[in-house]
UniProtKB/Swiss-Prot annotation:
This is Elongation factor Ts. Belongs to the EF-Ts family. The keyword Protein biosynthesis applies. It comes from Paraburkholderia phymatum (strain DSM 17167 / CIP 108236 / LMG 21445 / STM815). The keyword Cytoplasm applies. Pfam families: EF_TS (PF00889).
Length: 293
């Protein structure tokens, strides 16, 4: 049996970026053969990535990048809040955001196939899964390319906003982006609110109004009033500005001789159903599995 030295472990780690203990195990199994140990690790890390792929990723980060007339925000997901703070994961997210801006992929599939660090985005992601031990995924991105101005705002790493706007004052773009992160509008104007959201709100309003016992014509007016109120609350231009609630966003923009053409808002894990673990059941399952080995 060949002696496994610290320098051999360090060399293998430098080549594969795998955890130190995994490197030592691979070298031991390969009887000190560096090439064989590297091959064993590649297989093992690949298996880790495959096993992790079925696990729910509802935590994660938002990253942004703007260059010239193009900008993007991207959402990458992981399984735990702990890993969302991992430097390698955050660094990867920033590289992905930059690629979206510079390469303009059509979708996440095309993005995953782009070249990165001598490999592909998906291969780098898969290697990171093996290193960290959690499922990691690129969920979505938004990219704007325009002759207008762009502003991005990140609230920590969990909320990201990209805004396309006009106007001489760059602070306007920053203020609008921050407002969107805080107030989370669903559309630019009331005319742009998705029909399914309006239908849902109308249904709720109808149920509430019907319980009032008032005449049908009064109920109809109550429903219309509730829907109109909702439209104002969720459309950006109609919302009171967070830094001065005596003005709406539309009024603030008009005073600054500015306008907003488009925006994208991402909130980490939004719409993803998180896994609810039964800890006692999980431990029992692990004990049972251990007994069968």
């Amino acid at each position: 049996m060949a002696a496994i030295t610290a320098s051999m472990v360090a060399e293998l780690r430098a080549k594969t970026d795998a955890p130190m203990m995994e490197c030592k195990k691979a070298l031991t199994e390969a009887d000190g053969d560096m090439a064989r140990a590297e091959e064993l690790l590649r297989v093992k890390l690949g298996n880790k990535a495959s096993k992790a792929a079925s696990r729910v990723t509802a935590e994660g980060v938002i990253a942004s990048f703007i260059e010239g007339g193009a900008g993007a925000i991207v959402e990458l997901n992981c399984e735990t809040d702990f890993v969302s703070k991992n430097d390698d994961f955050i660094g990867f997210s920033k590289k992905v955001a930059e690629l979206v801006v510079k390469q303009n992929p059509a979708d996440v599939g095309a993005l995953s196939a782009l070249a990165l660090d001598g490999s592909t985005v998906d291969a780098v992601r898969s290697a990171l899964v093996g290193k960290i031990g959690e499922n990691l995924s690129i969920r979505r991105f938004a990219r704007f390319e325009t002759s207008n101005k762009l502003a991005a705002y990140l609230h920590g790493t969990r909320i990201g906003v990209l805004v396309e706007y006009t106007g001489a004052d760059e602070q306007v773009g920053k203020d609008v982006a921050m407002h969107i992160a805080a107030m989370k509008p669903v559309s630019l104007s009331s005319d742009d609110v998705p029909a399914d959201l309006i239908a849902k709100e109308r249904s709720i309003a109808e149920q509430k109004a019907a319980e009032s016992g008032k005449p049908a014509e009064i109920v109809a007016k109550m429903v219309d009033g509730s829907v109109q109120k909702y439209l104002k609350e969720v459309s950006l231009l109609n919302q009171p500005f967070v830094k001065n609630d005596k003005q709406t966003i539309e009024q603030m923009l008009k005073a600054a001789n500015a306008s907003v053409q488009n925006f994208a808002l991402f909130v980490v894990g939004e719409g993803i159903e998180k896994r609810q673990d039964d800890f006692a059941a999980e431990v029992a399952a692990q004990v049972a599995a251990a007994k069968q080995q």
